[in-house]
């Protein structure tokens, strides 16, 4: 045996000292090693093993010995060289194995030579670590690498596995030394199942390793997994079924296997399906995916309250109330901001979808029938239950959220109008939450409740005012600039709805669609504005839109009108200011201040004893009036055409001096042109009550007495009565007031002093703004609008409020587009 030969040589030649426990005189100095390097003296063997780690020295019956045996089998696999150790080779593969083994031995196999360097050698370097090997030290040389290449004994390892080459056996390949296993794998793939070299033409490659085709199978059931799904566990392939049955985890929530196809959540040795159902709070079942959780007693919770077993949904009554309020506010916010629309679009959607005569559900037919019915139903006080109580009750009860419609998707405002109303003759009013607003009412209103309850006549006017109040309340919350700041059809449409309160179906004879009128209104904004007295008038027009007073933003006005009928009808809705202000500012033209009748017999208020000097108050623009001027469409223009209304005229002593018409002739006279009459200011509403066309000279001296009016209505036909009524501005609203009011002489004198015979010198404020170079009666080549004759003048006792006027937009009708931009010059003033 080679080992015995080495031992004999070492004993006889060197007689080196042994580290074993055997007797030194036994002559068995090398017997303590299971293997020693060949060709070395005992002192050289000792020097060599001294360079190795203690656990790798092959002492007999030591760990080093076991390590050596293991490395022999691993680094030098017997099935890489001998056919008899192979299990599944065919004849062709056996022959190929023999050829492969012989070629490796011939070309790469070798054993390292241990030599002690001469002291003269000064520049030897280790190939592994690159450090210097000094003279007199042990070094290992490899014949296949060349004479000058050497390694330290501890550096003589496989280049692949970095393990000491067992028994100094190496395979040299491409300048590197390898063990037999890894050298063979450089040439041929090795099967991970049988550990044999694969000589077949085909193999399976998975997980960075190779298998024989039939060797890549489930480790449990040996099912071939080539082309199939598999799971690697501890370096071994398993089919899905075997893996789930042997290694799959159980879900802590549902108790089922967590399959290979399911993601799982793991915490502290527990496993859950990675689903919202399984990985959820054990108390409230809220999903905890991606959320922090609180583990407690093998269960997970979303909060400390749930871990204590509390019901997070339980709450006291106050908390429920807050939650309910938040829910309502949330729903309101969703309604107001749906479809990502801007605030203006939301306001427009509320403005532009009212139902047809939604304030008058009973108003139908032509204008004559409607107005006649309205005047017949009008009473002294606000009526009780009306014929449309059910309608208002239904409106109060229903709350329908505004549906998402196609027109709301368009950014262009006119496109929205055409899409929503282009082919509809009816409007639809979305109901809105009723929100109570502050009632700005005069004190004596509350005392008239008994009289109102007793009067059971079904007054359409009463329902109209109820609808005004309802409209004001339901539109609350849009902001005080909802209409005043928008110069487009929104403001126009809003004022048109106000006029529908008074005129209802007076527009029925003109079938032009409303959106065309709105388009005309938009065109007005593109025209230049005149810089004259209209500046102050325009500021008042803005006041009408935004609801701000000329005298201040929020200045409260004293209630001067105490007439029971109109006091209650108007203050209920007019003095109740909403956030929008459009309705209320328009209705203030017939508010308690402007409806203080000079001829009231019910309230015997006397004018102030001393005569205050007449002067025009300076107009001050408020904050809300600094916005761009709002133009109104033809919807708000009053031209004085009204339906047939029964009217009683006051006596001559109660009427101001003015020109009147021959109403019978006027009804047959064609309208060559109709001048525009818009809400330029509140004074315009009060003073611009004259007729539209100039009367002839013979008509100027003709006056009607109260008896003439009565005879006219009793003797004339319905058509003539209608023609007569077409110039009546205020009787349509206050028909029953004629016989109940009287005119104090002092106030009448003061009023007649303001309205003199010379219509061109009404007021210094207006006349001073007129150009002296202009032709009399014309301005900029256009006729100056003439005041319309009044039947009553309503103003306060001291004439101190700029709002002492009735709305001039009642029962208004359209004018031609060419007259829309003509400014109102010098014939209007403010009563201060």
From Swiss-Prot:
Membrane topology field: Peripheral membrane protein
Lipid-modified residues, S-farnesyl cysteine kind: 829
Chief place where the protein resides: membrane
Transmembrane helix in keyword set: no
Comp. bias intervals (Basic and acidic residues): 432-453, 603-614
Keyword Hydrolase recorded: no
Domain of life: Eukaryota
Coiled coil spans: none
Modification sites for Cysteine methyl ester: 829
UniProt-listed PROSITE patterns: LIM_DOMAIN_1 (PS00478), LIM_DOMAIN_2 (PS50023), PET (PS51303)
Region (Disordered): 312-346, 428-455, 602-701, 766-832
GO molecular function: zinc ion binding
Any single biological process term in GO: anterior/posterior axis specification
Protein name: Prickle-like protein 1-B
Originating organism: Xenopus laevis (African clawed frog)
């Amino acid at each position: 045996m080679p080992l015995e030969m080495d031992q004999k040589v070492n004993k006889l030649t060197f007689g080196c000292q042994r580290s074993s426990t055997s007797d030194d005189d036994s002559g068995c100095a090398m017997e303590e090693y299971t293997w020693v390097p060949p060709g070395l003296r005992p002192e050289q063997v000792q020097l060599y093993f001294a360079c190795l780690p203690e656990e790798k020295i092959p002492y007999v019956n030591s760990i080093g010995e076991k390590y050596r045996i293991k490395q022999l089998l691993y680094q030098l696999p017997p099935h890489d060289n001998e056919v008899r150790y192979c299990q599944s080779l065919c004849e062709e593969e056996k022959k190929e194995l023999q050829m492969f083994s012989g070629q490796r031995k011939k070309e790469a196999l070798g054993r390292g030579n241990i030599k002690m360097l001469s002291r003269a050698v000064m520049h030897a370097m280790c190939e592994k670590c690159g450090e210097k090997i000094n003279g007199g030290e042990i070094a290992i040389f490899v014949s296949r690498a060349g004479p000058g290449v050497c390694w330290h004994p501890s550096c003589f390892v496989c280049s692949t596995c970095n393990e000491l080459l067992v028994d100094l056996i190496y395979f040299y390949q491409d300048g590197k030394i390898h063990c037999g296993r890894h050298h063979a794998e450089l040439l041929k793939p090795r099967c991970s199942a049988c550990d044999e070299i694969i000589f077949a033409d085909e193999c399976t490659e998975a997980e960075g390793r190779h298998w024989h085709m039939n060797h890549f199978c489930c480790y449990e059931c040996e099912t071939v997994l080539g082309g199939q799904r598999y799971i690697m566990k501890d370096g071994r392939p398993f089919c899905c079924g075997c893996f789930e049955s042997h290694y799959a985890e159980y879900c802590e929530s549902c108790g089922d296997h967590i399959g290979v196809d399911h993601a799982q959540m793991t915490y502290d040795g527990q496993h859950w399906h990675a689903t919202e159902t399984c990985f959820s709070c054990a108390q409230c079942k809220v999903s905890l995916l991606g959320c922090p959780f609180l583990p407690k007693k093998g269960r997970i919770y979303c909060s400390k309250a749930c871990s204590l077993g509390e019901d997070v949904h339980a709450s006291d009554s106050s908390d429920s109330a807050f939650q309910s309020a938040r829910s309502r506010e949330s729903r309101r916010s969703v309604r107001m901001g749906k479809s990502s629309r801007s605030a203006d679009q939301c306001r427009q959607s509320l403005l532009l979808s009212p139902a047809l005569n939604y304030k008058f559900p009973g108003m139908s037919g032509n204008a004559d029938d409607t107005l006649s019915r309205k005047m017949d139903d009008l009473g002294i006080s606000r009526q009780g239950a009306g014929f449309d109580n059910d309608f208002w009750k239904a409106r109060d009860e229903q709350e329908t959220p505004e549906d998402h419609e196609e027109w709301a998707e368009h950014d262009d405002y006119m496109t929205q109008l055409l899409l929503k109303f282009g082919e509809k003759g009816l409007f639809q009013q979305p109901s809105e939450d009723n929100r109570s607003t502050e009632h700005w009412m005069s004190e004596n209103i509350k005392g008239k409740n008994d009289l109102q309850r007793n009067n059971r006549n079904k007054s359409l006017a009463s329902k109209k005012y109820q609808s005004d109040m309802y409209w004001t309340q339901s539109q609350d919350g849009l902001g005080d600039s909802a209409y005043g700041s928008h110069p487009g059809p929104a403001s126009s449409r809003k004022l048109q709805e106000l006029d529908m309160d008074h005129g209802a179906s007076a527009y029925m004879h003109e079938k032009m669609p409303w959106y065309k009128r709105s388009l005309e209104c938009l065109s007005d904004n593109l025209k230049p504005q005149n810089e004259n007295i209209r500046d102050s008038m325009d500021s008042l027009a803005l006041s009408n839109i935004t609801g701000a007073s000329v005298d201040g933003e929020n200045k409260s006005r004293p209630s001067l009108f105490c007439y029971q009928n109109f006091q209650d009808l108007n203050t209920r809705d007019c003095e109740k200011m909403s956030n929008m202000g459009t309705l209320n500012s328009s209705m203030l033209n017939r508010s308690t201040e402007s409806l203080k009748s000079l001829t009231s017999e019910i309230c015997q208020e006397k004018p102030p004893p001393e005569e205050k000097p007449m002067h025009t108050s300076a107009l001050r623009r408020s904050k809300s009036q600094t916005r761009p001027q709002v133009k109104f469409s033809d919807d708000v223009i009053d031209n004085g055409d009204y339906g047939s209304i029964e009217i009683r005229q006051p006596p001559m002593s109660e009427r101001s001096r003015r020109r009147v018409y021959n109403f019978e002739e006027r009804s047959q006279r064609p309208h060559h042109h109709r001048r525009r009459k818009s809400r330029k200011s509140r004074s315009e509403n009060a003073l611009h009550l004259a007729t539209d066309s100039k009367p002839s000279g013979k008509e100027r001296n003709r006056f009607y007495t109260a008896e003439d009016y009565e005879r006219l209505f009793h003797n004339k036909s319905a058509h003539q009565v209608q023609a007569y009524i077409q110039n009546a501005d205020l009787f349509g609203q206050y028909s029953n007031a004629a016989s109940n009011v009287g005119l104090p002489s002092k106030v009448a004198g003061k009023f007649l002093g303001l309205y003199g015979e010379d219509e061109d010198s009404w007021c210094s404020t207006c006349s001073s703004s007129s150009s002296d170079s202009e032709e009399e009666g014309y301005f900029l080549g256009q006729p100056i609008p003439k005041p319309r004759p009044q039947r009553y003048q309503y103003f306060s006792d001291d004439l101190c409020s700029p709002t002492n006027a009735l709305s001039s937009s009642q029962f208004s009708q359209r004018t031609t587009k060419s007259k829309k931009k003509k400014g109102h010059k010098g014939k209007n003033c403010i009563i201060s």
